[in-house]
Amino acid sequence: MVLSQLNGLTSPLDERHVHALQIALKGMTPTQLAWVSGYLAGIGGGPLRMPTEPKAVERITILFGSQTGNAKAVAEQLGARASEQGMDARVISMGDFNPRKLSKEQWVLIVVSTHGEGEPPENAYALHAFIQDQGAGRLEQLPFAVLGLGDSSYEHFCRTAVDFDRRLAELGAQRILPLQCCALDYRSDTERWSSDALNRLSALAPRKASNVVAMPTLRSHQDLRSHQEQSRNRARPYDKDNPYTATLLENRRITTLDAVSDVRHLALAIEPDAMHYRPGDALGVWVENDPSLADTILAGVGIDGAARIELGDEELDLRHALIERLELTQLHPTTVRGWSRASGRTGAEDAGERLEREEQTRIYLAGNDAFRLPDAGDTPLIMIGAGTGVAPYRAFLQQRAANGHPGRNWLIFGNRHFHRDFLYQLDWQAHRKAGRLDRVSLAFSRDGAEKPYVQQRLREEGKEILRWLDAGAHLYVCGATAMGQAVDHALVEIFTIEAGLDPDCASLRRYPARECYATDDL
C-alpha cells in the first residue's frame, strides 16, 4: 500500500500526519524503509491494539455501613437477589474492607446509613475517611452506585450516602445510578433501587452455572408431609420484613412510679433456633396501636373499618392498617421500636404499658457487629452509658460471668435521679459484690445543684481512663446522640490535657487501633 491510499476509514492519521510522513520517507531505499519500519514498531510498544468492547463484570462487591442492622439487611437481600440471578456477588461490611483495595474492585454497590449529626456508622468510618482524604487515588475505572438510609426529620438526612456518592464521582468513578436516599419507610425505595441496579449489571455480569435439581416425585401423603417439613426448615430467616412472633413472659417497670420516664424491662420467650443473638445486639419490636383508639378514630370519621385499602403493594382492611401499619398521630407507616437487649426504651412507654403477660408480639434481631465484647476475656472494659444505654452492659457482664472471663470492668452511668432512675441497680451491686465490677462512676443530673453528666465524670477520671486504655481497655459508649458527642469532646480534652496530644489527633476515632472504641446510639 502506498501512502496516497491511506484514508480516514483505515488510518488513524490525518492529512497533516500523512503529508509529514511522505516528506520523511521520500527518497529512501527499500533497505532504509525496512529499518525505519522495524524502528517504528519498536518505539510503538508492540503490536497495534485495537479498541475492545467493555469488559464483562466478573464480580460485584456490595459494601454496607450499618449501625443498627438495617443497611446490612438491605445489602444482604441485594446480594441474595444478585446470586439468584447468577451474578458473582459478595457482601462485605465496610469495617472488614481494605479501603486501599477500592481501586481494584470491578463494580461496587454501596448501602450505608447515617447516624448522629450526619456521621457515618462505626463500621463505615475508615472507608469514609479514606475517600475524603486529599491523597485518595483516582478511580476512573470503578463503576458505582449508592443507596442511603436515614431519617428525613433530621437536618443531615442521608449525609453519609451523599458524601460517598459525591466524593466517588469527584475521584472519577462512574456513577451508574443516581443516588437514592431512603427515609424510615424504605422498603419500596430499596427494592426499586435494587432492581434498577441489578438490571444495569445483568447485561454485563456473566452468569455462574446454576445447580438445577429436579423435584422428587411425592409418592404418598407421608412424602408430602416430609417435604413440607423440610421446606419449613429451609424458610428464610426472621428479619424486619419477616418478624418472629414471641411470647411476653415479663413486663416490669424498672423506674419508680414518680420517675419522669416509664422504663420497661421485657422478657420474651424465643425458640432457641429462631434467632441467635449476642451481647450488644438489639431487638426490633413491631408494636401495635391500641385497637380501642383505632375504633375511636373510625367512629369519629364515620368510616367502616372493613373497607379495603392499598398500602404499598399490599391490600388489607382499614382497621387492620390502623392497628398494625400506621402511626395514628400522622398516618404514615409505623416504624420498628428499637429495644436494647434486656431493657425498655423510653420512647415507647405507652406501648410497653399495653403489653400483657403471655401476649404475643412481633420482633426481629437487629445485630450490631460494631458493638461486641472483645475476643480476649482478659481485656479491660470501660462501659459508658446514659439512661437505657446501660442495658447492653448488663448483658456484657452476664456473658463474662458465664464464660469465666477475668477482665476488669468499669461502669460509668448517668441518669436523672439516684432513687428513681438507677436502672438495674441490684444487678450492678451483685456484680460489684462478686468482684466482676471493679469500678463504678455515677452521675445523676437532677439530684443537686451540680447537675453532673457522664462526660464530667470522664474528665474527673481522666488519668485513670488513660491508664486503662494504655492497658488495652476497650471503651464503649451507648446512649443518645448528644451524649455520645459530649463523650467524644471529653475524651479529646483528656488526651489533650493529660496526654499532651494535639487536639486534631486526640480523638479515639483517630486512634491507630480504633477497634478499642465502640458506640451504639439510642
UniProtKB/Swiss-Prot annotation:
Q: Which reaction does this chain catalyze?
A: hydrogen sulfide + 3 NADP(+) + 3 H2O = sulfite + 3 NADPH + 4 H(+)
The root-end lineage is:
Bacteria, Pseudomonadati, Pseudomonadota, Gammaproteobacteria, Chromatiales
One cellular component term (GO) for this entry is: cytosol
Q: Which GO terms describe its molecular function?
A: flavin adenine dinucleotide binding; FMN binding; sulfite reductase (NADPH) activity
What is the name listed in the Swiss-Prot or TrEMBL entry for this protein?
Sulfite reductase [NADPH] flavoprotein alpha-component
The record's section on PANTHER family has: NADPH OXIDOREDUCTASE A (PTHR19384:SF128), NITRIC OXIDE SYNTHASE-RELATED (PTHR19384)
Q: Name one GO biological process term.
A: cysteine biosynthetic process
First-tier enzyme category under EC: oxidoreductase
Supply the InterPro entries for this chain: CysJ-like_FAD-binding (IPR003097), FAD-bd_FR_type (IPR017927), Flavdoxin-like (IPR001094), Flavodoxin/NO_synth (IPR008254), Flavoprot_Pyr_Nucl_cyt_Rdtase (IPR001709), Flavoprotein-like_sf (IPR029039), FNR_nucleotide-bd (IPR039261), NADPH_Cyt_P450_Rdtase_alpha (IPR023173)
Asked whether the UniProt record includes RNA-binding among its keywords, one would answer no
Task: Fill in the subunit field for this protein.
Answer: Alpha(8)-beta(8). The alpha component is a flavoprotein, the beta component is a hemoprotein.
